[in-house]
Amino acid sequence: SDNVYAIDVEAGKVIWQKHFEYQPVTEGRGLREGDPLCPGGQTATPIIGPLNASGGRTVYALAGDGKLHFLNLADGEELETPVKFGFGNGKSYALNMWNGVIFTTTSQGCNGNPNQVWAIDIHDPQKKVMTFNPKSGGLWGRTGAAVDSTGRVWAPTGDGVYIPEQHTYGNGLIGTKVVDGQLQLQDWFEPSNWAWLKKRDLDMQVTPSIFPFKNHELMVTG
């Protein structure tokens, strides 16, 4: 629907509503009519940023045309010009944020959108989009990528092949991080029985949960 709502949860009232207006998306391969896996429109859950110097907060929302919007949490007004962050109708998943960098992931190749991790530094005047592509499998975690305590961004890769010497990381987990202005692979995990899992369509599809436990940092997915 390309709508964002701010709701007072105590009063049960809508404080403001923002609808994103844009021309029909013409880039990419176009939507597959009737395909529930590529619905088009806004599919990424917005995220609220930390307090800024003036004591306000920004809501970051990715509209269905592939543009990232910067909204005032107090009233929903645009704080700056929206910027491109992926293809329109590209089925981006929930946004996440770490030290001023916003992340999202994509799957299904909707409208020709590559299946990869996406990042954009909101403090970069150029708003350069950074990506890492595992070259196999969609990144299916509905709540996007998870961030560990070191700033590495983790996402599961769907059914695909694992050929690390060809930088192909399907059917596993990839951990990326922004280094020197680029989103780079830092680590990955691949089940020893990945081919067996692929054959049975048992790939990992859940955004990881990351938490501390007894002097370790654990990550759980499924």
Where are these regions (language model features)?
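Noncatalytic, solvent-exposed loop/strand surfaces
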Residues: S1-G222
